[in-house]
Swiss-Prot record:
Compartment(s) where it occurs, according to its Swiss-Prot or TrEMBL record: Cell membrane
Membrane topology classification: Multi-pass membrane protein
GO cellular component: plasma membrane
Alphabetized UniProt keyword annotations: Cell membrane, Membrane, Transmembrane, Transmembrane helix
Record gene name: yyzG
Organism: Bacillus subtilis (strain 168)
Descriptive protein name: Uncharacterized membrane protein YyzG
Domain of life of the organism encoding this protein: Bacteria
Membrane-spanning residues: 6-26, 29-49
């Protein structure tokens, strides 16, 4: 998979995860949960990109 495609998919997953956390909190903004979700997704992107670079 191309790096750009992986990043795009990960960003989409990140947004869906943040929206899900928001809805599960009863539509109350809890920046700690949403921020943690976004940081976790971006760390996942970083790991996947590093693994791809090692394989190629």
């Amino acid at each position: 998979m191309q790096t750009n495609r992986v990043i795009l998919l990960a960003v989409m997953i990140c947004l869906v995860s943040a929206i899900t956390v928001f809805l599960l909190n009863g539509c109350k903004v809890d920046f700690l949960d949403i921020g943690g979700t976004i940081i976790g997704c971006f760390l996942g992107i970083f790991v996947v990109v590093r693994i791809q670079k090692k394989q190629s």
